[in-house]
Amino acid sequence: PRVRRQRQMCIRDSKFILFHDGEKVKVARGVNSLQTTTQDKGDAWKKIKMVEVMDMIQTDIRTTAQDSYIGKYANSYDNKCLLVTAIKGYLVGLEQSGILQAGSSSVGIDLAHQEAYLQSVGTDTSKMSQQEIKEANTADKVFLEASIKILDAIEDISLNITI
């Protein structure tokens, strides 16, 4: 597409395009082919950079868990906390590298899933505190949850100048 409007229409349609700006060839926008978003997969899933970061985080955490935790530690609350601390440290490193928004990362035991598991194996959780649910024996299962905010690339700049 030769004109800006045509490029914008292609981007809107999730087309990856290159263009020449008069000096060099550039990527119009780092989008992938995803067109339909869902509640779970919003607009961030349309961006190549965002998906690459999500894939990297998933791969790094999975590899660390497999290499350093699975089968090597007893599934105690203290050892779950060690795993949580390791993941949090990794996420803070990504914040410091400018990949994640500073101060946005959290990780901890997924209380809802842990409680559901306990109930599924016959444990009455109705009188348990949140801390007791966190510390409860979950056999060989670890239920964690995390929240992050991935920083996108600068793509649109608006500058209003008043004279």
Task: Please report, for each region that a protein language model flagged, where it lies by residue.
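Single conserved hydrophobic/aromatic residue that forms the stacking wall/gate
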Residues: P1-I11
